[in-house]
């Protein structure tokens, strides 16, 4: 049974890979068609395109690293191939996490209502704020790459000095833990910002509901619905973050106990998260949901 597990997990990852490419490709295609036809696109749709493209890159990177780890381990743990795989994973993962955070900030500034002058200043310039944050995250990416590159150089120096396979594999596990720890530390910042945005949205909704009660207008007003929908989207991003940290935790456990099954489970979760969350984004966006239902209806009619 255990010998069949790699094949089973491979089939699951390939299925998730196909679903992830279809869902994220659908987001890019529909928004690009809308962009060409209307010659303009909202900030949300532009962010969705960037997020979908980065997720496609992440899914491809996970699939390639999966097959390299299973069939070409010597390439995976040494040389230029190692640097390319780790750097591509860092870049795609960076944009995945930070774009999720930027979405949370965008909904906070667009929907929440606070009387603070600083908040109102940011609210009136939301598009510039989002652009500046997106550019500012490149500093974190640059620092992350520098730190990881130091780990890689240190590992390659030790690898070239001692090519004994047992030594290389045990030392590679230490190197892998160092890389994952560094990435986790850099991932805490976007998660913290997204969580604060979520709390502020809840606080804004609570204030709005209290105001509605005082005015005897009830709770079922359009602004309450907008708040609720925004909270659902932000919660979905927080769940995406949770799955990411769960994946990292499981990966650490696999390194600690040298358990291949746990590693394969980690990779499976790593592909499932960006694939499934994109479907939630499609269903939560009116334009994408309508296009998806139209395509689904046409496909069903042809059967």
Swiss-Prot record:
Localization (cell): Membrane
Extracellular side stretches: 1-7, 77-85, 150-184, 254-261
Membrane topology: Multi-pass membrane protein
Cytoplasmic side stretches: 29-55, 107-128, 206-232, 283-303
Record has Calcium as a keyword: no
Assigned GO CC terms: membrane; plasma membrane
Tissue: Expressed in subsets of taste receptor cells of the tongue and palate epithelium and exclusively in gustducin-positive cells.
Keyword field contains Disulfide bond: no
GO term, biological process aspect, one: detection of chemical stimulus involved in sensory perception of bitter taste
One Gene Ontology MF term: taste receptor activity
SUPFAM superfamilies named in the record: Family A G protein-coupled receptor-like
More details: Most taste cells may be activated by a limited number of bitter compounds; individual taste cells can discriminate among bitter stimuli.
Protein name: Taste receptor type 2 member 13
Organism: Homo sapiens (Human)
Gene that this sequence comes from: TAS2R13
